[in-house]
Amino acid sequence: MPPPMIPPKLPPLEFIAAEALYSSIIFLICFLIYHRLREVYKLSDYRGFHFFSNTFLFLGLAYFLRFVVLLLSASGVMFEEISLEGLRGIMAFSMAFLAYSGSAAILYTIYSLLWRWLERFPGEVVINGVALVIALTSLLSRMPLVFLISQLALVFLLVAAIFVNYSHFRHESRSKRAYPLYILLFVFWLLNISLTFRFLPLEFRFAIYTLSVAVILIIAYRVLRKL
């Protein structure tokens, strides 16, 4: 999931350009992965693909919003035609939506691993409810640390879900093909969580962008060619 939005101070132009390019690439790749997984789900009727595809739906939505906000920043609309209070409101809304969509993406990944134990459980209702609570908490607190802690907690839950699923289904051919995808997603989220640390030099951020794009491209290759 993307890091929370930058405070209302115009960042360097190269930073905005890199962020916009990065966000657009991730959004487009997520759209392709989502479309392919929906096709596989319709052909196989395997519910795990439905939940897993929603991971990339919400991840793509998060990066699409970030791309739009960054374009507004680059054009100067937000900084020249909107008051400071209005700008803060837009940033707060963006942070809340990113917290919601990013949390929903991780929760859908977790549920795609555990749904066979929770078939009678209203999983999607709970996923959206928990994501909404995280978003509202981030909005009301206005503290990036709250967002960071919530995402770290969800990522650790993902690790636990991977181990639980692996211990029961590691001999299934479908599961064997899926585990590398989950591990790559774990790496992707760790890389993006590290972007919430504002003290990172631009060179480090650009390196993380490059690694993140490489990881999501590998995921796309495995989904588009091997599923």
From Swiss-Prot:
Query: Which residue ranges does UniProt annotate as crossing the membrane?
Result: 15-34, 55-77, 92-114, 121-140, 145-167, 180-202, 206-224
Has the keyword Transmembrane been applied to this entry?
yes
Question: Could you tell me the superkingdom of the organism this chain comes from?
Answer: Archaea
| Annotated GO CC locations | plasma membrane
Q: Tell me the membrane topology, using the record's own terms.
A: Multi-pass membrane protein
What keywords tag this UniProt record?
Cell membrane, Membrane, Transmembrane, Transmembrane helix
Per the record, the major location class is membrane
In which compartments does the protein localize? Cell membrane
Q: What is this protein called?
A: Uncharacterized protein AF_1460
